[in-house]
């Protein structure tokens, strides 16, 4: 318990240093754009790929499991849309990104720590936490709404592909179900949740990487701890935010 409280205290103190005003805005902006490409743009491929197949699989599974003469055929599209909007494209996708992006951030900062690059920045009078971590957090929070949007569209395209190429159901029925009682707030709720998840991924992973103490083995452990901790916090935040936004 004491160790956990110490960890939380160190995290809060690190975030206090991180959210200081950047000393050189031009350098910060350059680093910010670089992190957007590394953390956000480079994640588009895996987001589109996973979302496409998940959308297709959800459609097939729902069609097989709720097929009934008493159930309208468009129900498949309706349920697929709700799953993609409310949970998969925001929560589950961020859990996947926690593994990809979180381990990337933790290993990068951990390697800089064990090779004393962070110490060199401190000696030069640079706020290393602000210089290294803040661009990553801002980049993740900025790009995550686009990734969520891409995920939603990729999942819907995957659902339609099951109609066009696999003949699972009529595409007209699927389209009607996707449009039935559509509530645009569900999209905004998913984006709002993803903003919190993006902050958790970037800040928690940066904390474990920045505070590494040891050699290469410690860097590997920090990457694992970053992914596990981020995933647990995302699930907890998902529970709280879903209650607040949808309750």
Regions found by a protein language model. Give the residues of each.
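Hydrophobic alpha-helical transmembrane segments that constitute the membrane-spanning cores
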Residues: 50-53, 97, 134-163, 196, ...
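Final/C-terminal transmembrane alpha-helix of multipass membrane proteins
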Residues: 219, 225-242
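Short cytoplasmic-facing helical segments at TM-TM junctions of multi-pass membrane proteins
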Residues: 109-134, 219
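Short, membrane-interfacial amphipathic segments enriched in basic
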Residues: 1-30, 208-209, 213
């Amino acid at each position: 318990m004491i160790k956990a409280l110490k960890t939380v205290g160190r995290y809060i103190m690190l975030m206090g240093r991180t959210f200081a005003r950047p000393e050189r805005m031009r350098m910060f902006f350059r680093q910010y754009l670089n992190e957007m490409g590394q953390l956000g743009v480079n994640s588009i491929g895996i987001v589109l790929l996973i979302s496409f197949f998940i959308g297709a699989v959800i459609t097939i599974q729902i069609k097989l499991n709720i097929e009934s003469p008493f159930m309208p055929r468009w129900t498949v599209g309706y349920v697929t849309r709700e799953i993609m909007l409310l949970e998969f494209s925001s929560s589950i996708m961020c859990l996947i990104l926690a593994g990809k992006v979180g381990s990337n951030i933790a290993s990068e900062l951990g390697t800089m720590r064990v090779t004393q690059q962070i110490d060199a920045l401190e000696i030069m009078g640079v706020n290393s936490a602000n210089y290294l971590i803040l661009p990553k957090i801002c980049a993740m929070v900025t790009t995550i709404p686009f990734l969520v949007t891409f995920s939603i569209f990729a999942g819907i395209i995957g659902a339609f592909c099951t109609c066009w190429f696999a003949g699972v159901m009529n595409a007209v029925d699927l389209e009607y179900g996707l449009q039935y009682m559509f509530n645009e707030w569900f999209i905004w709720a998913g984006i709002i949740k993803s903003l919190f998840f993006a902050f958790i991924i970037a800040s928690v992973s940066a904390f474990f990487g920045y505070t590494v103490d040891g050699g290469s083995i410690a860097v590997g452990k920090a990457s694992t701890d970053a992914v596990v901790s981020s995933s647990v916090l995302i699930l907890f935040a998902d529970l709280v935010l879903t209650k607040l936004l949808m309750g």
